Swiss-Prot record:
NCBIfam families membership: D_ala_D_alaTIGR, PRK01372.1
Cofactor(s) required, per the database record: Mg(2+); Mn(2+)
Intracellular or extracellular location(s): Cytoplasm
Organism: Bartonella tribocorum (strain CIP 105476 / IBS 506)
Protein name: D-alanine--D-alanine ligase
Summary of the function given for this chain in its UniProt record: Cell wall formation.
One Gene Ontology biological process: cell wall organization
Family membership noted in the UniProt record: Belongs to the D-alanine--D-alanine ligase family.
Every ATP-grasp domain range: 102-300
Pathway: Cell wall biogenesis; peptidoglycan biosynthesis
Length: 306
């Protein structure tokens, strides 16, 4: 296996480009240390031609956001018959669409928060649901575009319908669940430990800065929860992973309100970050796996027709 040529796909042209470059560089470094022949590929418009010239044995997908985790790069890799890591075309497309992913997860017995999909221009000056609630782009990651509307706000934020909104017009309006931020990864069909995320006090919630700035958040893994809640998070993570058809690794995010006992699944990430501040490496460490172990497993798991 170590004589394989691996193309690490990174960068791209989504809002998460910088994160992808960090994830990709870290994964490429580890693969080179493990003895693989590695090509670092900053994905652009001509990626199909680039891959045809490189002829890699495996494509390691370290892309994040639209194009990288919504089924499009996966479709190109299927067409070129290049085995690749992470989820396939269908699961990637479904998981990227928060609305459709929630429907599938709920049908699999996963608890979700009440929500509705709307065009941002239709929100206007009337609350689309009783505050507090969250407005977020349907197909973005890393908390880009997330707005929390508090109980004391008389009208929805004006920027949702403004020209400064930098995302697609379709948004999800979802009931805000207060409480603890939890996440859980699935590796193949093995569910790993539950991790609690504690954003630094300077951040209102687990936003982009708290995710990627050094010291922006504290990861407690395994999370200190009752056995019932802990196992519920694991069960729902695996159920969502399987129902959506994910392959390789995924990570599901949750909110847990201790006052009411309400535990809800928020979304699933089919391309979890692999930066120095990312959650997956810490979750893997709690299960006795090193960063290199996870990357090695992904390479060995790579295939087409995922």
């Amino acid at each position: 296996m170590k004589d394989k040529h691996i193309a690490v796909l990174m960068g791209g042209f989504s809002s998460e480009r910088s994160i992808s470059l960090s994830s990709g560089a870290a994964c490429a470094d580890v693969l080179e240390e493990q003895g693989y022949r590695v090509s670092r590929v900053d994905v652009g418009a001509h990626i199909a031609s680039v891959l045809e010239q490189l002829q890699p044995d495996i494509a390691f997908n370290a892309l994040h956001g639209p194009f990288g985790e919504d089924g499009r790069i996966q479709g190109i890799l299927e067409y070129l018959k290049i085995p690749y890591t992470h989820s396939g075309v269908m699961a990637s497309a479904l998981a990227m669409d928060k609305g459709r992913a929630k429907i599938i997860a709920a049908n699999a017995g996963v608890c979700v928060a009440p929500s509705r999909i709307m065009n941002r221009f239709s929100i206007g000056k009337t609350h689309p649901m009783e505050p507090p609630y969250v407005i977020k782009p349907v197909c973005e990651g890393s908390s880009f575009g997330v707005v929390i509307v508090q109980e004391n706000e008389a009208v929805p934020p004006h920027n949702i319908g403004g020209s400064e909104w930098g995302y697609a017009d379709e948004v999800m309006v979802e009931k805000y669940i207060p409480g603890r931020e939890l996440t859980c990864a699935v590796l193949g069909n093995e569910v790993l430990d539950v991790c609690e995320i504690l954003p630094d006090q300077h951040f209102a919630f687990y936003d982009y800065d708290s995710k990627y700035k050094t010291g922006g958040s504290l990861h407690i893994c395994p999370a200190k929860l009752s056995l019932n809640i802990y196992q519920s998070v694991q069960r729902m993570s695996l159920a969502a992973h399987q129902a959506i058809g994910c392959r390789g690794v995924s990570r599901s995010d949750f909110r847990f309100d201790e006052k009411t006992g309400e535990l809800v699944w928020l979304e699933i990430n089919t391309q979890p970050g692999m930066t120095s501040t990312s959650l997956l490496p810490d979750i893997a460490k709690a299960s006795g796996r090193t960063y290199g172990d996870i990357v090695q497993w992904m390479v060995e798991d790579a295939s087409c027709m995922r």
